[in-house]
C-alpha cells in the first residue's frame, strides 16, 4: 500500500498543484485504505470519493489535499473539523502536526471512526458527537476551521469560533448537489471571502445547515 500512496502523491496530487510539503508528506503517510470499507480497499488510492455508509462518503484524495493546503496551517495550530466522516481528513491534519477537534453528527460513524483513530494512535485528534454547525464553543477559538459537508451559508457559530487572524475552508451553495469551495479569512475583525472552484459534498445538516 505504501507504493500506492506514493503513486497517488506523484500522479494525482503534485501534477494538480499540491505543493505544500507537509500536505504531501501526510498524504503519503496516512493509510487511506484503513479508512474505507474493506470491500472497497482496492480503490482506496484512486481519485474519487467512496461510500462509508449512512449516506456519507470519504472525499477523493485530491480534495482532501487541496482543502488541507488551502488552510495554510502550521504545526501546533488548533483546527476544528466539521464532519468527521471516515476520519481520513482528520488523520491527514494530525499527521501535519495540527491539534484536531472533529465533530460528527451520526452516532454510528462517530463511534466507528473514534475507535479507528484510537487504534491508529492519533492522539492529537479529539472526537465529539454533536451538531457540527454549532462548532465546539468551549474549546474555541480555533486557528483554522475545515468543513467537509456543504451547506447553504457559512454557519455563524463557526465564524465566531474562528481566531483572528484565522482561515476557514468550506463548501457553500444554494444547491444541495453542488457548491463552491470557499476560503474565509478573518483579519482585524473583518471577513474576506474567495471562491476556489466547484465541488460536490454531502449535506451539512444541523441548526445552521440544511
Swiss-Prot record:
Record-level Gene Ontology MF annotations: protein-L-isoaspartate (D-aspartate) O-methyltransferase activity
InterPro entries in the cross-refs: PCMT, SAM-dependent_MTases_sf
Role this protein plays: Catalyzes the methyl esterification of L-isoaspartyl residues in peptides and proteins that result from spontaneous decomposition of normal L-aspartyl and L-asparaginyl residues. It plays a role in the repair and/or degradation of damaged proteins.
Gene Ontology cellular component list: cytoplasm
One GO term (biological process): protein modification process
Reactions catalysed: [protein]-L-isoaspartate + S-adenosyl-L-methionine = [protein]-L-isoaspartate alpha-methyl ester + S-adenosyl-L-homocysteine
Family: Belongs to the methyltransferase superfamily. L-isoaspartyl/D-aspartyl protein methyltransferase family.
Active site positions, chain numbering: 59
Protein name per UniProt: Protein-L-isoaspartate O-methyltransferase
Record keyword Thylakoid present: no
EC number: 2.1.1.77
Transmembrane segments: none
CDD domains: AdoMet_MTases (cd02440)
Organism: Nitratidesulfovibrio vulgaris (strain ATCC 29579 / DSM 644 / CCUG 34227 / NCIMB 8303 / VKM B-1760 / Hildenborough)
PANTHER family the UniProt entry points to: PROTEIN-L-ISOASPARTATE O-METHYLTRANSFERASE, PROTEIN-L-ISOASPARTATE(D-ASPARTATE) O-METHYLTRANSFERASE
Matches recorded under NCBIfam families: pimt, PRK00312.1
